[in-house]
């Protein structure tokens, strides 16, 4: 089983403009698509498409639209209840092939919501499983959360991968070599942060 943790999930909205994006201008949208997002959810969707057993874990308020989208796609998931809504990330596609991204920070999680997320993750995995910790951390989650989770999961015999950046990546590096994940997926920019 592969379990993904998306600590800061999103609704990814992509709008395509009929022309060039001009700051301060009025623009017409030629298409508007919203889908589930967050690195861990994207990983889980890819794993499911490959026909492998996967479970996506993420925080979301009861009735959040993200849950409905994942239900509609048939992706196995467990969400931990939160008081805030899932963030929306906006991508604006305009001529001549330019993409502008605007990302919300996400709703802050309380210490009890962070603890519930950890509990769901650790109870979902068994020795020999793979856990993928992916993406940014929601506000309220300590920067060293992934580093802590690596140790907790590896102590249970779980293989752990991490795909993150900025402060969580630096905290992971600071915990190495004892708290090093089994695999790490940095891009060129993230490698430069180390």
Task: Please describe what each predicted stretch is.
Residues 1, 53-55, 76, 158-159, ...:
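Residues at the starts of beta-strands that form the adenosine-phosphate
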Residues 10-12, 97-100, 138, 191:
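Short, acidic Gly/Pro/Ser/Thr-rich loop/turn segments
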Residues 130-194:
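Conserved beta-alpha-beta core of the PfkB/ribokinase-like small-molecule kinase fold
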